[in-house]
C-alpha cells in the first residue's frame, strides 16, 4: 500500500459522515468513510458516490478498478459513476440482532497504486415490525381474596425495532376491575402489570375477558394484541415470594455448558398444596431459552450453550414461581456476560514514610510506588486512584511510577492516622483492579490551646462551709498528644485582695478542684470572682483563662433581734400608753425586729406567746403591729402585758421574744398614780429623784428661753434655718441603740436620735435632722420615759384646746399602689405579707434598708423620715424585714393621739395636713416663724 488519502466530500441526498482529513501517524491509513442508510432499502439504491468521496474522477473508477470487499457483501460499486449501491436485502434485525448500533464495515480498494479505504455503513432502523406477544391468549387465575392494588405481571410484547420504533406503551380494554401499569425493565424495556382496582367476587363473576394492546413509537404506530382471560378462584391467600425482585449475575464468556449460574428461591407461607412451588420461564426470548435451562422444581439455572460476549452482552430472564393454588409471582434474572481479562494490576511500594508531621505543607512526598499488569493492550494499561476522604493525591511520574504527596493541611487531633487505599485499575472490559492499603501516622505538634468545658463557671457555696472542702471543679481539655495535651491549673487573678487570696481559696494543679481555705460568712462576703488558667506542657506552652464566680449562700445563723420594745438602761421595761377610748383596729404600738440573714431566713413573723387579756389585742403576723380587737371593757385591767415571739423563715427557724407593757390612760398624769403601788424607793433613790426634778425644772426654764431666742433669730434671718436643729443642747437627747446591749455585734448596727422641742404643744414626738451636735451626756430622756412625761405635762395642761382640735392624719404623702417600692405592693393591714419575687429582689430591698439604717446610725439623715431616708426612732421604727418597703409613717402612730409622724413633720415645717381640721392658727404661726 502507498500513496495518500484524497480529499473527500459528501455526495448524494443521503446522510454521510465525513472522515478526518489525513491520518495522524501513518500516511497510508485514513479515517473511515461513513454512510447512513435505512434498512430494507431497495436493491440498486445509491448509498453514496464513493469515488467522489475518495477524490477519484469518473475515469479513475474503471482505470483504478474501484471495488469493495467484505465478509458478506451487501454493496457494490457502479463501474461507470463510482456510486456505492445496495446489492442485497438489508434487514437490520437480522444483521445486528439486539445491538442498538448497527454498522457494516467495508474496504474500498483501488489499484495503481494500491490503496485500501475503510468504509462504514450505518444501518438505521425503520418501523417494519409491529409489537407481538408470544401468545395470543393469556390465561390468569386470580383468587377472589386478593387485596386491592395487587399487581400481576403480564407477558411483555417483543418488537425487534429499536429507538422510537420499538415498543412504546401498553393499553388495556376498559373495565371496572383492573387497570394497567407500565414498569421499566433494567435493560430499558417495558412490561405491563395488571393491578386489581375492585374486589373480585367469584360468585358474582367467575371470569373476566380483557384485551391487552402493545403499541410502538413509530409514525404511524404499529400495534399487537393479546387476549387476557382471568379465572377467579377461591382463596389462596399467600402467593410465592422471591427473595429478590431482581437477580444479577456476571458470567465470563468462557464458562463451559452445564455451569450452574444461579438458583432462584421463592417461598410461600401457605400450607399443603398451596405451598408447593414450581418455576418456569415467562416471556423469555427464544435465544435465552436456548442458552439457559431452568429446573422447574429447584429454580436452578444452568447454561446449555457457550456464551458469546460479542453476540449478546446481557440476558434478561423472567422467571415465574407458581404454587399449587394458582398464585404466582415473578422475578427477573439479569445475566451479564463478561469479556475475558484475567490478570489484575499489581501495586509495588518502593519507598514509604509512615511518620508525617501534622504541620507539613501540601506537596510533601509520602510514598513512592509503581504498578505492573501482565496483560497487554488496553487490559495492561493501568490508572491509579485513592480512597475518598484522605488529604493526599497521586502524581504520575514516568514508566508506571507514582508519587503519593500531601494535598492539604493535616490535623492530628481530627485524624491521628490515615489508612490510605491505593487502587490500580486496568482498561479492560470489564476492568480488573487491585488495591493496597498503607497506614500513615501523623506526628503531633502543639497547635491547640486548652479549652474549658464552659465559658464561665458559677458555683453556690453555703456559708459556714468546712475549711478545706471542695467547692468547685474546672476542667479543660487539650486535644494534643503527650505533654502537648497535659493540662495544669492555677489561680491568676481575683477581685479579692491578692495578699489574702491564698487564705480564701486554692486550686489543685492536676485536677482543677477548687478548695475553700476558710469558712465563708454570707453577711461579710456574698460573692467573689476568680480567674483560673489552664496551661499545657508544650513548647511553647499554650494557655486559656476562665472566670469562676462564687456565690456565698445564706444560712439561718442569725436569730432575730428586737429593736422595739427595748429595755431601759437600768434593765426595766418601758410601757406604752393607750387611749381609753381606743376603738377596734386602733394601732397601739408596733414590734420592730431585724434579722442579719437574707432571703427567707430574714422573713420575720410575729406571734403572741402570752397575753394578760387574750381577746383584747391582735398582732400582725408580718407587720408586728399591735391593734385593738375590741374596746376596753369595764372589767378589763388598765395594765396589760403581751409576750411576743419573733420567728424568722429559716429551717429550723430562730426566734426572739419581747414583752409589751401597755397602760390605758388618756394622759401621762393618769399613768403616774398607777405606779404608786410600787415599793417605796430607798433614801438614795428618793434623793436621786429630787435632783432629777430640780434638773428638769431648770431644763424647762432653759427650754423656754431657747424657744424665745430661736423665734428672735428666725425673725432676723432672711433664710430658713437648718431644719431640725435643737434649740438648746441641754434639751436635746442623744440615745444609743435601744435594742439589746450586744446588738452592735451583729451585721446591722443602728443608732436612733431624736430631739424634743419645748414649744411643741401637742403630746406627740417630732423627728428632725441629725443631732450630732447634741452632747453625749444629755441622755436623760432615754433613761426614764416617765421623766419625759413629766416634762411634757405642763405644755399639755397649758393648751387643752389645741389638744381637742387634734388634726387627722395627713394623707398627702402616702404612696399609691403603683408608687410604693418593694416587690409586694402596698402594705395592707392584714396579718399576712408578701414574699419577695426572687433572691435579687430580696437582697436589693435589704440593701436599701441597710443603707437607710446606716444613715440613721451615722446621724446623716433625719429621724422624721425626710426625703430619701428611712431613719426612724427606736420605738416607732419599722421592722427591717423583706416583705415591704413603703413609707413607714403611714402605719406608725403616736400612742395617746390620732396623729401620725406626717402630722408632726407637717406641723414642724409649717404645713397643714391634707384634709385635716387641726389648729390652723398655730400652723400659721409656724409659717410666720
UniProtKB/Swiss-Prot annotation:
Primary location class:
membrane
- Signal peptide positions (record): 1-30
The record's Gene Ontology cellular component field reads:
plasma membrane
Provide Extracellular-side residue ranges: 31-691
Domain Cadherin, chain residue ranges per copy: 31-133, 134-242, 243-347, 348-452, 453-562, 570-675
Could you tell me the Gene Ontology terms of the biological process aspect for this record? cell adhesion; homophilic cell adhesion via plasma membrane adhesion molecules; nervous system development
The biased composition feature labelled Polar residues covers 807-838
Indicate the transmembrane segments per the record: 692-712
* Residues modified by glycosylation: 419, 545
Q: Provide the protein's localization.
A: Cell membrane
| Region of interest called Disordered, as start-end residue ranges on this chain | 806-838, 899-929
Function, in words: Potential calcium-dependent cell-adhesion protein. May be involved in the establishment and maintenance of specific neuronal connections in the brain.
Protein name per UniProt: Protocadherin gamma-B7
Q: Which organism is it from?
A: Homo sapiens
**What is the gene name?**
PCDHGB7
